[in-house]
Amino acid sequence: EIKEDLLGKKTGRVIYRDNLTVFQTSGGECRFINFLGMDWHYAVSSQEGVNQYHVWFVPEVAEMLDQDTVYLAAFSLEKQAIKDHSMILHSAYMCYEDTAVLFSAPSETGKSTQAGLWEKYRGTWTVNGDRSLLIREEDGWYANGWPVCGSSEICNNKSYPVRAIVMLSQAKENRISRLKGLEALRKVMEQITINAWNSEFQIQAMDELEILLKEVPVYHLECDISEDAVRCLEDVLAGGRGEE
């Protein structure tokens, strides 16, 4: 009944993704959300006004709200965050010398592994193993905790100024280079939660990313899982520039 009622209010085209159906109503955006490979929806999110949403879940997912894919998609939090100059970055968020170092990469690359190496060899600690909320304040960018953390089970509510974003890739030898311009923009943007179907959102995200990249260095760390990977990044954080 809910689905039929909302579909009756749709305006404009319907956008279909592998796990998401999105369309506009008079109140704003409406989402039908399903798991990949499933043809039934586990949640419906309907925007009724600027800051008002109605969300319905099927009972079977009531215990899954600690999973980011469920939590984030249903509550449309990235849409609210961008209005406050904030973005959600897929990253392992490490506290190092009271600053935030963010390891970012596609899933299964080794973000939490690298953060774990720093804990083991340098005594740092991980704030969140899978997400960070980047907020632009008057004095710069800050990384903040996020309510859920994927499979890492590391989830703390702490805020530190962002020292660096480190894009990871697996390699047999450790080396680091500074990313700039379009390359840095593309790499970071791939790991930001973005509504690809919403042109206004994309423009806002691009504007925020341009500001971020002017203020925060982005590195590409090709690494293994040894202490040498830690040293490689540590040298740059201590004042080195990395390979240009």
Tell where the protein language model's regions lie, with residue ranges.
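Hydrophobic positions on the alpha1 helix immediately C-terminal to the Walker A/P-loop
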Residues: Q114
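Conserved glycine(s) of the Walker
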Residues: T109-K111
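A noncatalytic interaction/capping subdomain that flanks phosphate/NTP-handling catalytic cores
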Residues: E1-L102, S107, L117-W125, S132-E244
